[in-house]
């Protein structure tokens, strides 16, 4: 059980038979009446977002999520197949379960798969990944690091804004949380 006063961004709770993750929260203490916590919750299974208000100090069941490190091995008929490298057990996730993470997911990558009651829910990518640029405007002599940016398409199909001096075939480091360019990778 967790108190509504202890909510933080990313806290997972069980509500109405499903797992919800706190996206935003605000402790409100009005001049008259009792304090409450206004939250924005996201359903982990479906991705729907709702706003819900709880009394301050209200006890709610905390969702016990299990994280396991698995390797993305291949895709089969729209499903993403992951393997536990110690037990060689396979886990399948649909494109909906993976969500936006699929734009950075490539074969051989190790990720954390979050499960609840033995059912895989979602994939957590590393904070940064190294990917190759497959398509972008060519770099022109004189372009500098302090100049502007241009769109580049990466090997997984993701589009990221990169500095003007980068060209096709170069490997770059990308922040998976906000789709930003972090730097060149050798």
Swiss-Prot record:
GO terms for cellular component: cytoplasm. GO terms for molecular function: translation elongation factor activity. Disulfide bonds: none annotated. One of its GO terms (biological process) is peptide biosynthetic process. It comes from the Bacteria. Keywords: Cytoplasm, Elongation factor, Protein biosynthesis. It is found in: Cytoplasm. Pathway: Protein biosynthesis; polypeptide chain elongation. SUPFAM superfamilies: Nucleic acid-binding proteins (SSF50249), Translation proteins SH3-like domain (SSF50104). HAMAP family: EF_P. Belongs to the elongation factor P family. This is Elongation factor P. It comes from Prochlorococcus marinus (strain MIT 9303).
């Amino acid at each position: 059980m967790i108190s509504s006063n202890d909510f933080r961004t990313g806290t997972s709770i069980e509500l109405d038979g499903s797992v919800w993750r706190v996206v935003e929260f605000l402790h409100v203490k009005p001049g008259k009446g009792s304090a409450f916590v206004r939250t924005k919750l996201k359903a982990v299974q479906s991705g729907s977002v709702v706003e819900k208000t709880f009394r301050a100090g209200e006890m709610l069941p905390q969702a016990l999520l299990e994280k396991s490190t698995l390797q993305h091995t291949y895709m089969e008929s729209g499903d993403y197949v992951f393997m536990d490298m110690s037990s060689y057990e396979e886990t399948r996730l649909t494109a909906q379960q993976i969500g936006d993470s699929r734009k950075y997911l490539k074969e051989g990558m190790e990720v954390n798969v979050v499960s609840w009651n033995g059912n895989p829910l979602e994939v957590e990518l590393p904070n940064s990944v190294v990917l190759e640029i497959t398509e972008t405007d060519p770099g022109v002599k004189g372009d500098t690091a302090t100049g502007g940016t241009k769109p580049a398409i990466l090997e997984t199909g993701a589009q990221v804004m990169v500095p003007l001096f980068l060209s096709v075939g170069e490997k770059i480091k990308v922040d998976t949380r906000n789709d930003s360019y972090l730097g060149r990778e050798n």
